[in-house]
Amino acid sequence: MSASAVFILDVKGKPLISRNYKGDVAMSKIEHFMPLLVQREEEGALAPLLSHGQVHFLWIKHSNLYLVATTSKNANASLVYSFLYKTIEVFCEYFKELEEESIRDNFVIVYELLDELMDFGFPQTTDSKILQEYITQQSNKLETGKSRVPPTVTNAVSWRSEGIKYKKNEVFIDVIESVNLLVNANGSVLLSEIVGTIKLKVFLSGMPELRLGLNDRVLFELTGRSKNKSVELEDVKFHQCVRLSRFDNDRTISFIPPDGDFELMSYRLSTQVKPLIWIESVIEKFSHSRVEIMVKAKGQFKKQSVANGVEISVPVPSDADSPRFKTSVGSAKYVPERNVVIWSIKSFPGGKEYLMRAHFGLPSVEKEEVEGRPPIGVKFEIPYFTVSGIQVRYMKIIEKSGYQALPWVRYITQSGDYQLRTS
């Protein structure tokens, strides 16, 4: 089962607009939502699902609005939340910003969209490009589209319009990998994960078919266990344009792309990644009069690669003052509102090792709890490099007019949630 009704509430919990899909939950039940939300917030027990008797409220907050779905059955919660987020995405496509004013100014279109987005409590058409074929907006009024069959009915490509033309046909491919890392105070890696995306920026005429080939080292989770030095990708998700049947057969990623920017695929890699930037720190206090901090940073990636925009955030006591710094490279500054020293290194080549020393006065005699000390955080970006070793082997562009197109590939490895605890 899915949603019985969907409400859009203002910040005070007053319904701006609602749609009853099944009629099995009284619309007046929404009056219990805001008092329940406030109560749970005060108790520190706020949850994305709230219940009042037999009625369940599944909600999300966006700007100054609450989107709430009600149900009295054992609903598929993940489906409902996915629908609510997709609804926000569609509204933002139509109104640029989703807020109370845009709902009030466009309530006719909002009602039309709610009718098309869900049918009898189940998500129906949530692709904004399909919806824009027959629900159009001009001067806050609803227009009826031309009398023709929607593309979805004719099996046409809903995510790409016909007749697109460019003087120069190009495709830009970005392979971006974010490294999530957590190291404890003893230097042991507690969490190591790579989250990757392949993003495309497409400037191609006509209705081209693209075929993307990845290097032979890459295996997908469906193929079984990895062998030798191959990379096994997990949680692989594709854009709807990818022909999954073709992929299941021969692992070719074949698709007719949307125009412009889109995310072709995402993946995750749970593996023991060697920390790309290793941090060693010594923090010493002297009779509650001063604190000395020494931080050593080492680039543990290939010497031919360079990390750009490196920022190392080192926590300091909240009552520290009179900062003095000495760095072997880059610059350091004290950010008192965050209680950190930020050591910035513009360019950090692989294999290099740098040092930063900081001195602070400690006017207070309060004892700081060691276990409450935040970790050191690191930000960086390494171009022309992927941790997993994934590479685009080829990109074939096939279009009936036979034009030549240029594919450009860029690789970026960047920090995600990258933290090292201090002793």
From Swiss-Prot:
One of its GO terms (biological process) is protein targeting. Phosphorylation of membrane-bound AP1M1/AP1M2 increases its affinity for sorting signals. One of its GO terms (cellular component) is cytosol. The keyword Membrane applies. It comes from the Eukaryota. Pfam families: Adap_comp_sub, Clat_adaptor_s. The keyword Phosphoprotein applies. Its main location: Golgi. Residues 168-421 form the MHD domain. Keywords: Cytoplasmic vesicle, Golgi apparatus, Membrane, Phosphoprotein, Protein transport, Transport. PROSITE patterns: CLAT_ADAPTOR_M_1 (PS00990), CLAT_ADAPTOR_M_2 (PS00991), MHD (PS51072). InterPro entries: Adaptor_comp_med_subunit, AP2_Mu_C_sf, AP_mu_sigma_su, Clathrin_mu, Clathrin_mu_CS, Longin-like_dom_sf, MHD. GO terms for molecular function: clathrin adaptor activity. Adaptor protein complex 1 (AP-1) is a heterotetramer composed of two large adaptins (gamma-type subunit AP1G1 and beta-type subunit AP1B1), a medium adaptin (mu-type subunit AP1M1 or AP1M2) and a small adaptin (sigma-type subunit AP1S1 or AP1S2 or AP1S3). Interacts with P2X4. Subunit of clathrin-associated adaptor protein complex 1 that plays a role in protein sorting in the trans-Golgi network (TGN) and endosomes. The AP complexes mediate the recruitment of clathrin to membranes and the recognition of sorting signals within the cytosolic tails of transmembrane cargo molecules. This is AP-1 complex subunit mu-2. It comes from Homo sapiens (Human). The lineage of its organism: Eukaryota, Metazoa, Chordata, Craniata, Vertebrata. The gene is AP1M2.
